[in-house]
Amino acid sequence: MFDDQQTNEPVTCSFCGKTQDQVKKIIAGPDVYICNECVDLCKEIIDEELASENAPTEITDVPTPAEIVDYLNQYVIGQEEAKKTLSVAVYNHYKRINKMAETKADEDEPELQKSNISLIGPTGSGKTFLAQSLAKILNVPFAIADATTLTEAGYVGEDVENILLKLLQNADYNVEAAERGIIYIDEIDKIAKKSENVSITRDVSGEGVQQALLKILEGTIANVPPQGGRKHPQQEFIQINTTNILFIVGGAFDGIETIVKNRLGDKTIGFGTNASTTVEEDKSLMQQVIPEDLLNFGLIPEFIGRLPILSALEKLTEEDLVHILTEPKNALVKQYKTLLGLDGVELKFTPQALHAIANQAISRNTGARGLRSIIENVMRDIMFEIPSRNDVAKVTVNKKTVIEGAEPEVELIDEQAS
């Protein structure tokens, strides 16, 4: 403790500035004082850092592809082919990491190369959500990046290393954990070359970004600025090995159907059939995309080569969207039923109302992503009024409520009792 008789000046904590009257205790050191509150804070910081350092960095029990699909089925409706492709790819990726850790010194073992993934599908088909769900079941750090914000070094915009910074931040700056994480890069189709003609000006956000991404996709020791950006040139860099980071890229690739159709147009499908009428008989055009089509779309060969696994997601139908509203563990209808249930009110959506919500999402071309904003708009007045009433037993949302904004059907407690 300290001797306050040696000076008439009030003693304050050297860290937070609080006086002895404002805290329980102040501990004295050589020309320095610390209060009990700052001691507690220091202990919390040290405990957090130790917990981060001791966090497991290996996935000891990698779920099988079947187990991964079973998990995805709880949250993702449809897209069966994509789920199967992703589950196998992710299983092999983390099995490869564990194998490499076991056989580092064995030069006779064959080298297992990383297989990053491309997801092609319309807006709102579930590309981002699939990637998030994979990271969740594997309990690995996850980060999302937008390809449209990236530029090559020397231009205004985000460096590709900032993608790794997001992953590192989500791993609480545990480098080893980040090096086994998953990064999802959205809007990857937006960095395709716009044409085959060589432009006089530099392609800042197209081919240049593809070139900048090549090394981290393949595996390199990247220097990551802990403060991000280019505003702190004197900062020390954190080195991250990207060899074991799984990269998943996604994009809508609007217009790629035409490229696929042109490729298939010269080929006869089946015996004595017209190719132009049978292109979509067995699979949708999106399901028939191959690397050659991505090349024609504007991705460079080296970039395509770093993404050997290709999976296409189909456009969600009205029936799919209705299932998304009602079936998954985190279904929006289930969430709203629970919220109103906390006020003692039962909530019901008629089948016609659910189809009307799904139809609006399709007409807006937003897919599953647009469902929340539509249902939020439908439920706003209901969620505003119900907490102020104690006579409501049940609320039924019908088609008119969704389309015209009409009042929902309300059943009162007295009516239900009678």
Swiss-Prot record:
Coiled-coil stretches: none
Binding site for Zn(2+): C13, C16, C35, C38
A single MF term (Gene Ontology): ATP hydrolysis activity
Cellular component terms (Gene Ontology): HslUV protease complex
Highest taxon, organism lineage: Bacteria
Keywords from the named record: ATP-binding, Chaperone, Metal-binding, Nucleotide-binding, Zinc
Statement: the UniProt record of this protein carries the keyword Nucleus: no
SMART domains, A to Z: AAA, ClpB_D2-small, zf-C4_ClpX
UniProt-listed InterPro entries: AAA+_ATPase, ATP-dep_Clp_protease_ClpX, ATPase_AAA_core, Clp_ATPase_C, Clp_protease_ATP-bd_su_ClpX, ClpX_bact, P-loop_NTPase, Znf_CppX_C4
Gene Ontology BP annotations: cell division; proteolysis involved in protein catabolic process
Binding site for ATP: P122, T123, G124, S125, G126, K127, T128, F129
CDD domains xrefs: RecA-like_ClpX
Domain ClpX-type ZB as annotated: residue spans: 1-54
Signal peptide: none
Keyword Plastid: no
Family as reported in the entry's similarity comment: Belongs to the ClpX chaperone family.
Record's subunit section: Component of the ClpX-ClpP complex. Forms a hexameric ring that, in the presence of ATP, binds to fourteen ClpP subunits assembled into a disk-like structure with a central cavity, resembling the structure of eukaryotic proteasomes.
Function per UniProt: ATP-dependent specificity component of the Clp protease. It directs the protease to specific substrates. Can perform chaperone functions in the absence of ClpP.
Name of the molecule in the record: ATP-dependent Clp protease ATP-binding subunit ClpX
Gene: clpX
